[in-house]
Amino acid sequence: MGQVGSAFATPRGGGKTLVVFYSKSGNTQTIAEMIQEKTGGDLYEIQTVRTYPRERPAAADIPKEERETGNLPELRGAMPDVSQYETVFIGSPIWEYTVATPVMTFLRDVDFRGKTVAGFYTFAGDGRHFERDLRNQSRNAHILESAGFRGTYDTGRGPEPDGRAYQAKRKEEIGRRLDAWLKKILMEKVTDEQYNGT
């Protein structure tokens, strides 16, 4: 994977790569770390001031209220300086078919002008609205095709699912899928740059 990694780590113009993610149970974090390893990019974890409950219905009701009211969660820690990057990967678990609200906060607060954004997500159900909403919420970004990876489902009862252990069992399969996806979007990125004269 040296060719794909080096191409994203030092894309045309000498830009850098940033891998941003939010993860509750480790599923999305594991994928993010694999992308970071393959691209040689920097890693940034989105963290919230508020801790989300596992118990249902609160686990679903709180994010739903955040989306409907626009009162998105406050993030903890300093934001990365996105201006120094050319390519930004953004990872999220699927919450109610779409981007998790902590990731929505990050997207709201960042201007991606001149940046290329590629999304990835982990799901236990249906991520049908992820790519549409990522595109709509990534201000001024050039969006590449997203990729989805199956994750664990938390019922809110019993032990919390270990997403990292679940993904570790599938590491070879995930690695092959990531390789194919990175090659595909790299070709898309280079083609777009050539078409736009950049």
Stretches found by the model and what they are:
Residues 48-56:
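Glycine-rich phosphate-binding loop and adjoining beta1-alpha1-beta2 segment
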